[in-house]
């Protein structure tokens, strides 16, 4: 259903299910990165290393408090076993480090351990900022359709829509794709209204619940009265990481290529559909007007 809307932000997914369930058909069925990693860890990684999935624990460190709710979703369990066992926010992880006397600034830099899916690209890095998910996806779509690599995606402020940026990607013979990026749930209502009325001009829309994206998530470390400066600094750092990466496209990640070659077989295979995709349900609380008899009974009982 067009326009397609991103599904990696659990705060946004919760908002759709609880407030605007009529938008569910527009949500991409792709799981969030956390949910995908968990499902692959409990299947491919466990199989490769001969580990019983029941004995494996996946702990996720996230800037987002809504990731805790996502980890508990019934759709993200296999035979009752959650794909993600525990979610710590960045603030919670910082408390753990402090409790054990660990100061990251005093520790020499080193490479991460690489047990599983540890090679990362610029496209993976920019997921953390508003517009990054869209750009990462469009880089791969452009390559699949045209066989070429896409340059920088240019966004312009959308007229009459606060906190919304829009752009156009030319896919050659396939035509042009109109994209939009919105962050902050208070700013998405205008677009939702256009979708309901059949007037939305976009094909693909990225929505992030937190202003600025995940870099300013509810679980991030904050300082009083200076969070905007820190958000800008984090954003610039992420774009520098993207620019410095030798590989900037998801489809060129060697780990992703090996994943499909050795396990998933191909995009949209049965195994890929099972492990990389999910579904949503209407969780809207229906308001019920009490009848006269019910009201009178409450009055009578005081």
Predicted regions and their residues:
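Iron-sulfur-associated redox domains of electron-transfer enzymes in respiratory
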Residues: 1-302
């Amino acid at each position: 259903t067009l326009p397609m809307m991103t599904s990696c932000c659990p705060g946004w997914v919760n908002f759709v299910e609880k407030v605007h369930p009529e938008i569910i058909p527009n949500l991409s069925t792709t799981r969030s990165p956390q949910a995908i990693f968990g499902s692959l860890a409990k299947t491919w990684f466990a199989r490769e290393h001969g580990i019983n999935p029941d004995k494996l624990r996946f702990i996720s460190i996230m800037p987002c408090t809504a990731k805790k709710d996502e980890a508990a979703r019934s759709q993200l369990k296999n035979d009752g076993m959650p794909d993600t066992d525990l979610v710590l926010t960045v603030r919670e992880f910082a408390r753990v480090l402090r409790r054990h006397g660990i100061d990251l600034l005093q520790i020499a830099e080193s490479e991460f351990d690489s047990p599983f899916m540890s090679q990362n690209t610029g496209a993976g890095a920019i997921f953390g900022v508003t517009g990054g998910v869209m750009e990462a996806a469009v880089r791969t779509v452009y390559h699949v359709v045209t066989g070429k690599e896409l340059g920088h995606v240019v966004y312009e402020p959308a007229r009459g829509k606060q906190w919304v940026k829009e752009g156009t990607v030319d896919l050659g013979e396939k035509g042009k794709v109109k994209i939009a990026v919105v962050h902050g749930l208070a700013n998405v209502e205008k677009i939702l209204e256009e979708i309901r009325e059949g007037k939305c001009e976009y094909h693909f829309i990225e929505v992030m619940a937190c202003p600025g994206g995940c870099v300013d998530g509810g679980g991030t470390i904050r300082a009083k009265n200076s969070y905007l400066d820190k958000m800008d600094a984090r954003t610039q750092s992420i774009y520098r990481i993207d620019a410095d990466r030798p590989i900037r496209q998801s489809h060129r990640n060697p780990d992703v290529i090996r994943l499909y070659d050795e396990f998933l077989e191909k995009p949209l295979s049965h195994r890929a559909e099972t492990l990389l995709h999910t579904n949503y349900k209407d969780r809207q609380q229906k308001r019920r007007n009490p009848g006269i008899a019910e009201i009178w009974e409450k009055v009578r009982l005081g």
